[in-house]
């Protein structure tokens, strides 16, 4: 078998390889644009050589992952933070990175991570695309609100009613401002049907998955949040306890404690930003419609600050959804979920 450590870049890859049977070692740089990398791996496939490739989790590598899967080669994806922690030398070059990856694979210390399936990744694009379009629509609506306010019209949400739209179009504006209004309204009209189509598609995908429907029984959690949660988390078996969910999503505070003094900073913001956003939004919706969540939110907001309370409730929601999914149970107001629910000595999940 040939073991290859790949330091991947968008335009090229630096590799270090070892053939176990012969002990042959080598290093090589392969370009992507001229097909050099693809020809190299296809040649290995034609020669019947078994290959295992290790690389850090990175972007812009989908084509490379598909190529290796097509050729039947084994691909290991590693956690960049853990790989960096295993570095001994102070030098950091592309060659050193490739050598480090190869050494970790040989010594069976390579920190492999879970990799979503192609279907999972494609469905994530659906959720992401809708989210980005909604953000674009919000920016367009804010610009139209600004145009109206500059003319002394503060209609807020009424601007999007049929009457508000008519009044906006009647405003006497200067030539370029009038053109801006017209083109923004045209963009808005084109985006609404697209967002509706994507929303319907996401709702249909949610109905196909029992675990998504189960998470939707929680107050404030709709099909988009539940679907995104299932797609991004992948499987609850990846995590030992609920606290790891908060760490994975990036909803825990960073810490720089020393000398017996605890110093907590802003949230780490590691992990998927879309899921982090959706959890915080869903937690606010739950606080509006559920008395228990409202009391907890108000309690936290009075102790600290509203922004901190929102993030804390988002983390709590992420933990609750994890245990609902892992234990296969629907939401129940009489059941409290903690970070160690279901473990020995904590049967009811209270913490």
Question: How should these model regions be labeled?
Answer:
Residues 93, 214-217, 223, 227-307, ...:
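Phosphate-backbone recognition surface of nucleic-acid-processing proteins
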Residues 128-214, 340-341:
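Glycine-rich, often acidic, oxyanion-interacting loops/wings at catalytic, nucleic-acid
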Residues 34-52:
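Short, basic/hydrophobic alpha-helical segments
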Residues 76-128, 132, 167-170, 261-271:
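Short alpha-helix plus adjacent loop in nuclease-associated cores
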Residues 11-36:
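Short glycine-rich, Thr/Ser-proximal phosphate-binding strand/loop in the N-terminal lobe
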Residues 1-19, 101, 133:
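Gly/Thr-rich phosphate-binding beta-strand-loop-beta motif of the actin/hexokinase/Hsp70
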Residues 54-63:
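Acidic, metal-coordinating catalytic cores used for nucleic-acid/nucleotide bond scission
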Residues 301-351:
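Basic, amphipathic alpha-helical segments enriched in Lys/Arg and hydrophobic/aromatic residues
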């Amino acid at each position: 078998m040939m073991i290859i450590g790949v330091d991947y870049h968008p335009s090229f890859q630096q590799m270090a390889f070892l053939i176990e049977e012969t002990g042959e070692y080598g290093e090589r740089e392969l370009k992507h644009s001229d097909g050099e990398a693809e020809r190299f791996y296809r040649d290995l496939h034609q020669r019947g050589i078994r290959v295992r490739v290790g690389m850090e989790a990175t972007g812009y590598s989908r084509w490379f992952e598909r190529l290796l899967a097509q050729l039947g080669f084994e691909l290991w994806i590693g956690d960049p933070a853990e790989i960096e922690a295993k570095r001994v030398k102070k030098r950091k070059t592309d060659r050193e990175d490739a050598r480090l990856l190869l050494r970790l694979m040989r010594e069976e210390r390579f920190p492999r991570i879970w990799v979503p399936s192609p279907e999972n990744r494609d469905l994530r694009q659906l959720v992401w695309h809708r989210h980005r379009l909604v953000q674009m629509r919000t920016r367009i609506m804010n610009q139209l609100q600004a145009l109206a306010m500059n003319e002394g019209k503060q209609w807020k949400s009424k601007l999007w009613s049929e009457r508000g739209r008519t009044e906006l179009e009647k405003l006497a504006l200067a030539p370029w401002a009038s053109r801006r209004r017209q083109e923004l309204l045209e963009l808005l009209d084109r985006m609404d049907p697209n967002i509706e189509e994507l929303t319907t598609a996401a709702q249909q995908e949610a109905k196909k998955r029992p675990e998504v429907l189960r998470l939707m029984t929680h107050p404030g959690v709709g099909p988009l949040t539940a679907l995104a949660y299932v797609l991004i988390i992948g499987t609850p078996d990846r995590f030992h306890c609920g606290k790891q969910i908060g760490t994975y999503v990036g909803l825990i505070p960073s810490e720089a404690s020393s000398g017996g003094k605890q110093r907590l900073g802003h949230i780490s913001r590691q992990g998927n930003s879309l899921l982090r956003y959706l959890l915080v939004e869903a937690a606010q919706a739950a606080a509006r419609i559920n008395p228990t969540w409202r009391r907890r939110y108000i309690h936290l907001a009075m102790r600290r600050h509203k922004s901190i309370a929102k993030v804390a409730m988002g983390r709590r929601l992420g933990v609750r959804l994890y245990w609902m999914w892992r234990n296969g149970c629907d939401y129940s107001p009489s059941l409290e979920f903690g970070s160690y629910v279901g473990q020995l000595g904590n049967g009811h999940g209270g913490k």
